[in-house]
């Protein structure tokens, strides 16, 4: 009887009912909770911008510690302001990359598209503004924070993802990170899914699903970019 009613409901509404589990790729949080062997205790938000993702993860994982990394001072100040009411929240005013260093970041129009990638991080005009920032590696910061693991590492750094992962090679090899959620795309501005897989697969991280698929801004409706969840193979 229950199965009959389920089918009738689906026929009448055009909806699909799932009893215990959604299909992979439907909901990031659902997939992480399904795969994780323990509660999510630590989330790192790399390329935090003004706190949008930190607020989202704090709501979905209310008992976790959120660490946000944002090097640009104007974004960082708004990050602090927007997340001031969050418990267990820590903001860090530096970038994460392949080595510990200091560098200059050039501002590229909208604040969400600043990038440290060499071919993107350059002045577009004589009046292009810039800021001196610090860069640290994930391996260094994990040791500095005396943190043994990071459950979820989110990276949105406008094409600089491989460099961030390059600074986490030791931590990744030692499986100190469980989930990696990062932006991928089809044009040169984004890291390709193939390049990320080539980096992560040999050290034991495999792609699990795609999320937030976005069409090209020109309105042609072809796929432009999306987010990919990589999972350490022991959890699969």
What are these regions (language model features)?
Residues 1-236:
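Phosphate/nucleotide-binding beta-alpha loop and adjacent structural elements of enzyme active sites
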